[in-house]
Amino acid sequence: MKTKIDYFDYDTLLQPTDWRFAAAVVGLCKYFDYFGIDYKVLCDVEEKPDNYIHGFDGIIYKSEDITEEKYLEFAENYFEKYMTHKNILNILESQEFIEEQIKLVNDLVKSKTVLKGLFDKIKFDGTNKDVFISTIEENRAEIIKNIFKNGNNLYKNYCNERLIFTEDNSTCRLRGYNVDKDRKTSNLGFCFSKESFESNDILEFDFIPFAFSNSDMRETYFVNNNFSVKSLTQTNYAFSNQLSSTENKDDKNKLMLVLQNSKDYISYDVEIISKSQDKAYYETFFVRLERLKKLRELSGKSLNFVKKINDDYWFNLEKEVYMRCLNNVLLDDVILMMLKFYFDDNAVKGYIKSRTDMLIDINVSWKGNEIMDEIKSAKSCGFLTSKKLIEMKSSNKINSYKQKIISALCAHDYDRAKEIILSLSAYVGMEFSFFYTFLENAEENKDLAFAFASALIEVSSKNN
C-alpha cells in the first residue's frame, strides 16, 4: 500500500501489503541503493508515521527522488546486456574495425526499431564512428526507453508498455491487471456493473521488473516473503543467484532445484509469483514448509528419466515428481506411466524398474502408510514369482501377468487386479503374504500392487 505521509523530509510510505507492492519495494530498494539515495526502512525507525498500516514493514522515501531520467539510467545499468546501443558503443571503442565488426554494428542497428529510425540513412562503414557515437549519446534516453519498454523479457513482459512512467491510470499497468480503455467496460465488474470493478495503479509498479529473477529465463520468479523489507530483498537476491548458478535445466526444474536448496533463507510457508513470456498474466503458487521439507528429502535421489511422448510433450520424471511434491499430489499416475513405459520398444527395463521402485517408496512415505514391510514383501514375491515361472519354463507369462495387473490398475479396477494376482498365486503355487493387506483396502494400498508388478521381470534364475 502506498501512503502519503508528512514525516520529517519524507512524503511517501510504501508497504508490502500484497505481492505487487512487495515487488515494487524490492525494485525501489535496488534503485535507491544504486544512486545512493537516502530512504528509511519502517521497522528500523523508532518514531513511526501517523498513518502506517500495522503488521507490515515498508520503506519511507521522497517521491521527488523518483525521476524518469534516473529511472532510465537505472534500467540501462540493470539490464545492460540487453541494451543494444551499449553493445554498439563497446564495439566503437576500437580504433580500427574488421569486416565482422562493421557487419555486427549494422546488424545491431537493424535489430531495434528505435535505432533503425535514428540511423535510417546512415550505414556504419568503419570511418564514421563519431556520427554513431554522437547520435546515440544525443538520443540515449529515447533509445533506453524504447528498448526497455518493448523488450519481451524486460518491461513489456510485466507491464503494459504504453503506460511506462505514467500516473493517474484508471487501471493497473501490470499484465493481467490491465484493461484496454477502448473496449466496452460494462462486463468488467460484478453483475456487469463497471462501477463494481476495482483497480489501483501507482508509478512505483514500474519497478516490479527489477524485483523478478533472472531476465535470461523465459519464466521468472518473485518470492513474496513480506515479513520484512530485509527478508524480501535478501531472499530474492539469494534466490536469483541460485537460479543463475543452476545450469542445464528448464525453468521449472531450476525452480524446483533451487527450492530444494533454499533452507538457508526459506524456512516458512511462502508465496511465489511467476511470470512467463508465453503468458499475458502472472501466476501464483503457495509453497508450504511441510511440502518444502518433502522436496528437500528428495535431494540426492536419482530421478533422471526423460521420454518423448509427442512433438509437444516430453515426460520429465524429475519435474513431474517435484511439481507433485510441492502441490501435495501423490505419485500414483506417475508410477503407472513408468510401469507402462517398461513395455515400450527399446526401453531400458532395468533402469525403468529401479526408478519405479524408488517412486513407490517415495509415494508410500508421502501417504504416511505404515506398509513398508509389506512393500518389501510384495517386491520379494514378485521376484520369486518371476524366478518360479522361469523354472516352470513359463517365462512368457511374466510379462503377460505384469501387463494384465498394470492394465487393471490403470483402469482403477481393483477387483480385477485382485483376481489376476490370485490367479498367478495359484498358478505358481505360492502364497503372497502382502495380498491380505491389499485385499482389505485395495485402493488405499495400491502401492503393494505397484511394487509386485514392478518386480515381475524376466530375470535369470541364476541372478538370485
Residue ranges and their predicted role:
Residues 1-130, 134-141, 282-464:
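Long, contiguous all-alpha helical interaction modules
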Residues 178-331:
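Domain-exit/linker segments immediately C-terminal to small folded modules
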Residues 140-144, 149, 173, 224, ...:
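Generic hydrophobic/packing signal
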Residues 146, 150-184, 189-203:
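Long amphipathic alpha-helical coiled-coil/heptad-repeat bundle
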